[in-house]
């Protein structure tokens, strides 16, 4: 195995500031596992990092946290994971292990948490390091491409299973037909909920895909009256739950009066600004439970991998482009054009 590798690194804060650099291949010591990366999905957070939209980012750092690969080396304190195992990994690289959240394995809430691809070098490289506790073995029939979607799917499982307990009887709105919205849709249909998927005119191709993936109703909110659609479907009561994957304040405020009294609003997408103006009148008067859903934790991953392995998620429809690691910039540009669903980077295309 070579002692050096290539990686896509955010070198400094600000717009772009990206470079394709040489790095030393990390060593798997203690409880760490070294993974030869097969695929990495480009996440919306990677694009925000590229654009310099996060304050005080850790730099330099190799990006990438949605990945799959094969174990090539294990540390001395790794009893279960073996060289040759096909794996994916949670994004948690370090937690304090002492706070109340860590004691409940709610690692996404640990105030000292460090994540792969954000504070610790990530998977947009030939190799990535992970801790054994974060590793999940892949079923034999689950492809590396599909497994690289485990992380964003786990985030959606967290929102639907843990934070809001979506049920068969529920009628819901999912706002934003990007990758996260489409993952939420497919989970909801697996559960059996009635789904109204919303977007705007430029999302036409994504709304069409949403219909193909099982959305009961699709609504272009620039052309159709969402309130009228919801009131007709729910006899005026409103939907049971709204999941926002858009991070668009106008969309959020348009949906709040359409939630059934004592219903739920689940914020999955991130807003561009820390402070936003919300329709608090609807939240109060309708007794809406407004819920934040942050990332994922260990409890979400087995469900996500099971959904992928059983075919509940349409892997082929979700992955619309693949690029070798050397063409990472073209891959980022393609994502930023806004016409793709999920773009994958192949770190070792000659081997997987």
UniProtKB/Swiss-Prot annotation:
Keywords: Manganese, Metal-binding, NAD, NADP, Oxidoreductase, Zinc
Any one Pfam family match given in the protein's UniProt record, by short name: ADH_zinc_N
GO biological process: arabitol catabolic process
Activity regulation annotation text: Inhibited by EDTA, 4-hydroxymercuribenzoic acid (PHMB), mercury and zinc ions at a concentration of 2 mM.
Residues involved in Mn(2+) 1 binding: 43, 65, 151
Keyword field contains NAD: yes
Keyword Lyase in record: no
Primary enzyme class: oxidoreductase
Listed InterPro entries: ADH-like_C (IPR013149), ADH-like_N (IPR013154), ADH_Zn_CS (IPR002328), GroES-like_sf (IPR011032), NAD(P)-bd_dom_sf (IPR036291), PKS_ER (IPR020843), Zn_alcohol_dh (IPR050129)
Molecular function as annotated in GO: metal ion binding; NADH dehydrogenase activity; NADPH dehydrogenase activity; zinc ion binding
Catalytic activity, as annotated: D-arabinitol 1-phosphate + NAD(+) = D-xylulose 5-phosphate + NADH + H(+)
Cofactor note: Binds 2 manganese ions per subunit.
pH dependence, record text: Optimum pH is 6.8-7.3 in the reductive reaction and pH 8.3-8.6 in the oxidative reaction.
EC number(s) from the headed UniProt entry: 1.1.1.301
CDD domains linked: Zn_ADH4 (cd08258)
Residues that coordinate or bind Mn(2+) 2: 96, 99, 102, 110
CC cofactor: Mn(2+)
Function recorded in the entry: Involved in the arabitol catabolism via the arabitol phosphate route. Catalyzes only the transformation of D-arabitol 1-phosphate (Arb1P) and D-arabitol 5-phosphate (Arb5P) into D-xylulose 5-phosphate (Xlu5P) and ribulose 5-phosphate, respectively. It can use both NAD and NADP.
Quaternary organization: Homotetramer.
Family statement drawn from the similarity comment of this UniProt entry: Belongs to the zinc-containing alcohol dehydrogenase family.
Stated name of the protein: D-arabitol-phosphate dehydrogenase
């Amino acid at each position: 195995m070579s002692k050096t590798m290539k990686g896509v690194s955010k070198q400094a804060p600000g717009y772009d500031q990206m470079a394709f650099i040489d790095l030393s291949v990390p060593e798997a010591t203690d409880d760490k596992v070294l993974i030869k990366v097969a695929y990495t999905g480009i996440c919306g957070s990677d694009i925000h990092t590229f654009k310099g939209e996060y304050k005080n980012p850790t730099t330099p750092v190799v990006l990438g946290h949605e990945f799959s690969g094969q174990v090539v080396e294990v540390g001395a304190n790794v009893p279960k994971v073996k060289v040759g195992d096909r794996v994916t990994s949670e994004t948690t690289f370090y937690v304090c292990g002492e706070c109340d959240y860590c004691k409940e394995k709610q690692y996404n809430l640990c105030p000292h948490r460090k994540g792969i691809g954000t504070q610790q070098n990530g998977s947009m490289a030939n190799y990535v390091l992970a801790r054994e506790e974060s590793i999940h073995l892949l079923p034999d029939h689950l492809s590396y491409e599909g497994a690289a979607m485990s992380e964003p799917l786990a985030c959606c499982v967290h929102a639907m299973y843990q934070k809001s307990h979506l049920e068969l009887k529920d009628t819901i709105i999912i706002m934003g037909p990007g990758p996260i919205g489409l993952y939420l849709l497919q989970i909801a249909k697996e559960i059996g909920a009635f789904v109204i998927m919303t977007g705007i005119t430029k999302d036409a191709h994504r709304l069409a895909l949403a219909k193909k993936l099982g959305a009961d109703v699709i609504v272009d909110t620039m052309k159709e009256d969402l309130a009228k659609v919801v009131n007709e479907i729910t006899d005026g009561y409103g939907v049971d739950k709204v999941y926002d994957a858009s991070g668009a304040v106008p969309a959020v405020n348009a949906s709040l009066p359409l939630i059934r009294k004592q219903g739920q609003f689940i914020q999955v997408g991130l807003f561009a600004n820390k402070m936003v103006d919300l329709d608090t009148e609807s939240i109060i008067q309708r007794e809406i439970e407004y819920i934040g859903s942050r990332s994922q934790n260990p409890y979400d991953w087995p469900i996500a991998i099971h959904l992928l392995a059983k075919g509940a998620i349409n892997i082929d429809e979700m992955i619309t482009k693949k690029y070798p690691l050397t063409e990472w910039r073209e891959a980022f540009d393609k994502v930023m054009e806004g016409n793709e669903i999920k773009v994958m980077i192949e770190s070792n295309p000659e081997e997987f």
